[in-house]
A protein has these predicted regions:
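Structured, solvent-exposed acidic/aromatic patches
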Residues: 1-154
Length: 154
């Protein structure tokens, strides 16, 4: 499915969300099993925190750059629905880039040059970042704002 053009954007959206969840886990626990996390076995090795951050920065850049604004979308998107409830691809792109910005800020004390490189790149295209509450990432079901899950607010 990953190489099937009809699912191109949906795969990238899933990867953006996967990286968001991994970013939450790494910020809480530090090094975690990421590179082999989904392989069967009891003894999955832990990855270094810095390696995970670099991998997420690369993954999110590839996802944001790879989204095709006229491509496929989820028919029902509980996070960034458009007016028709399908995926709002521009908001997914903004989310991926804003998450990259957050990760770059997190690594600035450990690798200032990498952090500066990423931040400078993102600020050159500030229109591709979350800029208002309309861009917020909220996991919500239905039309009722009270049905959102506050754990996933970004």
């Amino acid at each position: 499915m990953e190489n099937d053009e009809q699912y191109h954007n949906r795969v990238l959206i899933a990867k953006i969300w996967e990286n968001y969840l991994f970013s939450q886990a790494v910020s809480i626990w530090g090094g975690i099993p990421k590179s082999q996390a989904f392989n069967a076995g009891e003894r999955v090795p832990y990855d270094k925190e810095s390696d995970i951050y670099y991998a997420m920065l690369n993954d999110l850049k590839a996802c944001a750059d790879g989204l095709k604004m006229d491509g496929d979308v989820y028919k029902a998107d509980p996070i960034f629905p458009s007016g028709q409830k399908s995926s709002d691809l521009l908001k997914w792109k903004k989310f991926a880039n804003s998450l990259r910005l957050r990760l770059a800020v997190r690594i600035c004390n450990a690798d200032r040059s990498k952090a500066t490189e990423v931040i400078d790149e993102l600020m050159e295209n500030e229109q591709n970042l979350m800029t208002s509450n309309e861009d917020n990432c909220l996991l919500q079901w239905g039309d009722n704002a009270d049905t959102r899950n506050y754990f996933y607010d970004y």
